[in-house]
Amino acid sequence: MDAAYLEELVAIAKEVDAYIFSDEVYRSFDQPAPSIVDLYEKGIAINSLSKTYSIPGIRVGWVASNTEVADILRDYRDYTMICAGVFDDMVATLVLENKEAILERNRQIVEENLALMDTWIARESKASWIRPASVSTSFVKLDVNRPIEDFALELLQGYGVLVVPGNRFDKESHVRIGYCCDKEVLQKGLEKLSQFLNKC
């Protein structure tokens, strides 16, 4: 979502005095929009180190909001979690202290691998997509003659390629492909996916 779209959303929310809860975990590298909390006093933004920062294992995230909401969430957190792991906090601190270098590295991976995905989609007659913004995952439509869950399981068992079947998102005949990995791994995975598609 770009800034203009967010400002339209804020105007609608203000008319009815509504909060806007914005999941900013997948913020795009190439279309940086402002955070909802910078546009609206009733904006609530969540983010984490999992996606854009590529540190999913430590499970560290945050909520940004006005003071009233922050106090409610802090009280709730006290009842659900004593504290985060010390190691997790140390890794999170290190990542955030080196934020720009890490984001630049990840931006480069996204750009290069998205170009590989573009090439594969252009060549693969049984695949199509709405090209994603520069984020870490894509949602690809596949021309297959079986339930997508079965397709994904056979792809994993027969070729060692893992995709998330689209029925998990109420979209049959689609798969989610995470493409921010080593380029050679991505190329090999896409080749194997094409091999399996050609057999279907």
Model-derived features: where do they sit?
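Helix C-cap/helix->beta junction micro-motif
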Residues: 15-16, 124, 159, 200
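A short linear hydrophobic-aromatic micro-motif
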Residues: 125-129, 161-166
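Conserved glycine-rich beta-strand-loop-beta hairpin in the small C-terminal domain of fold type I
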Residues: 93, 109-118, 128-142, 173
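Active-site pre-lysine segment of PLP-dependent enzymes
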Residues: 1-55
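A generic structural signal for well-ordered alpha-helical segments
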Residues: 13, 121-122, 155-156
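Conserved core segment of the aminotransferase class I/II
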Residues: 44-111, 118
